[in-house]
A protein has these predicted regions:
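Conserved metal-binding segment of the jelly-roll/cupin
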Residues: 106-127
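Non-catalytic, conserved peripheral segments adjacent to functional cores
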Residues: 1-108, 133-175
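Hydrophobic heptad-repeat coiled-coil signature
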Residues: 115, 176-178
Length: 178
């Protein structure tokens, strides 16, 4: 069976949920979650400069993070496990400024989220997980910033019930190292 790329633009302009190319047979599966030409054919310019992975335990929240300089668009996919992935529009001129959207990413559904420049990004780890980031800009520690996961103005509705309640949360703000 072959599943072609599918691009679903969210109502936060420039953000997408992407179903990658996937070919399965009796041996297993082949998944391609990025192809520069396919992305460009769908109106998305996402040139890769850095790829990394995070490994997280159930109950961790990787809070809303972003870069103040050299904005970093990202293609995010859960390779294994399950995360509730959240993006936040941080563009003051945008009609959706301050709004957030969440989507369940799992190793099984293989969906990706394209996080545009000038957006915040974070996630709740529902199951022990490995998450892939394919970034259009390298990480600049001096420009790293974030918003608390429980910020009252954003009022993100994290699915705490999936991890046994909010008292089981372990907050972290990832500081990547080169």
């Amino acid at each position: 069976m072959v599943q072609k790329f599918d691009f679903q633009e969210l109502d936060l302009q420039g953000a997408y949920i992407i179903t990658p190319f996937c070919a399965t047979d009796n041996r297993g599966a082949f998944i391609k979650d990025y192809n520069i030409d396919t992305f460009k054919d769908n109106g998305i310019n996402h040139d890769l400069k850095e790829v990394f992975y995070t490994i997280s335990k159930k109950g961790v929240i990787r809070a809303i993070h972003f870069q103040l300089i050299k904005q970093q668009a990202k293609l995010v996919r859960c390779i294994s496990g399950h995360v509730y992935d959240v993006i936040v529009d941080l563009r003051p001129e945008s009609p959706t400024f301050g709004q957030w959207r969440g989507v369940h990413l799992t190793g099984e559904n293989t969906k990706c989220v394209l996080v545009p420049e000038r957006f915040g990004h974070g996630y709740l780890v529902v199951e022990d997980s490995i998450v892939s980031y394919k970034c259009a800009e390298v990480f600049y520690g001096e420009g790293d910033s974030g918003i608390m996961y429980n910020d009252p103005e954003l009022a993100i509705e994290w699915p705490y019930d999936l991890i046994g309640g909010s008292d089981t949360v372990s907050y972290t703000h990832l500081r990547a190292h080169e």
